[in-house]
Amino acid sequence: MMSLSHATNPQPKPAAAPHTLAALLAAGGLAGKRVFIRADLNVPQDAAGAITDDTRIRASVPAIAACLQAGAAVMVTSHLGRPQEGAPDPRHSLAPVGRRLSELLGRQVPLLSGWTEGGFQVPPGQVVLLENCRMNTGEKKNSDELAQKMAALCDVYVNDAFGTAHRAEATTHGIARYAPIACAGPLLAAEIDALGKALGQPARPLVAIVAGSKVSTKLTILKSLADKVDNLIVGGGIANTFMLAAGLKIGKSLAEPDLLADARAIIDIMARRGASVPIPVDVVCAKEFSATAAATVKDVKDVADDDMILDIGPKTAAMLAEQLKAAGTIVWNGPVGVFEFDQFGNGTRVLAQAIAESKAFSIAGGGDTLAAIAKHGIADRVGYISTGGGAFLEFLEGKTLPALAVLAQRAAA
């Protein structure tokens, strides 16, 4: 297991390296201790609730298994989706996660609801899954009262959820202030180490793929990357907004016209540095958004008023693939089309294959990105797969992540 103290990253250096679970395990003494693990089990699900990619669940297993082997009484929780606080919601239950975790651990993992007040016992060497932490009132606002209640449940708090490290919530930040011992799990430590080493002095050209439905959710990151990367490939609704900014028609496609000035500014910043935001030359359109919609490839100048752009076209995909194959470092967050529907998945498939074939060091993160990697079977040909989404991108941007900061503060105290 890698220590946070060995990481070289763009973040401000903390006063002290956070304690790690690895160090606690090496020292012994976890036997009989109550260990509370905040994992990131926020996995994608289909309409029926079935898990479509279990990467994050599998990534959580090493910390859980190590604590069980050490004889600890283990409690694990995570968020799943965005349920309303204080209102149990079967649609956001961790039950499917619990079933998969049971299979991976080879033992039954009971699911407990209403757990914040305690009143339950976990025998040493056993594990329970605590229902979706975002159902607890005060979780998202980092309630001090809730944090203290949760801290009272444990002797050791372990944060093994890099994917939520950018959020100051009760299970990622508050509890770490009050638990008797607070430390970083192996996944969290490994994420920071790998990402930091990759970004210390990245091999050039540095190419980033940032895709998603809205520019607004990734505007700060896009602006930051505009100062760093050599090519900024945009996809999804984000690409539509950039196409509008470039004076192209996008029909009735998802876009944010109020952010055209920001998109143009990013294009200009890149151009002044001799870098680029490649704009699609062809796209795949449909008249409706559905799994059965007919797909039509069109040059960008031929997009009709009633068209929806749902993928990049084959010429654009080939052009971007060449950039990826020539890259020194690749950062990937987000599929470039509606890859869940096969007729709009070619762009993502071509870029995924190019990343797999590139000699560049590649790092990829984000739930949909993990699903695309799994779908195309390239996991063993991506340099490092991060289980973080927003945290992954904010780390790349160099922001201080609250969950890491509080662990560093505890270590320094």
UniProtKB/Swiss-Prot annotation:
Catalytic activity, reaction form: (2R)-3-phosphoglycerate + ATP = (2R)-3-phospho-glyceroyl phosphate + ADP
The protein's name: Phosphoglycerate kinase, chromosomal
GO MF entries: ADP binding; ATP binding; phosphoglycerate kinase activity
UniProt superkingdom: Bacteria
Catalytic activity, EC: 2.7.2.3
Keywords: ATP-binding, Calvin cycle, Cytoplasm, Kinase, Nucleotide-binding, Transferase
BP-aspect Gene Ontology terms: gluconeogenesis; glycolytic process; reductive pentose-phosphate cycle
Subcellular location: Cytoplasm
Subunit structure of this chain's protein: Monomer.
Annotated positions binding ATP: K218, E340, G366, G367, D368, T369
The family this protein is said to belong to: Belongs to the phosphoglycerate kinase family.
Gene: cbbKC
Keyword Kinase in annotation: yes
GO cellular component terms, A-Z: cytosol
Pathways involved: Carbohydrate biosynthesis; Calvin cycle
Major subcellular site: cytoplasm
Species of provenance: Cupriavidus necator (strain ATCC 17699 / DSM 428 / KCTC 22496 / NCIMB 10442 / H16 / Stanier 337)
InterPro entries according to UniProt: Phosphoglycerate_kinase, Phosphoglycerate_kinase_CS, Phosphoglycerate_kinase_N, Phosphoglycerate_kinase_sf
Binding annotation for substrate: D40, L41, N42, R56, H79, L80, G81, R82, R134, R167
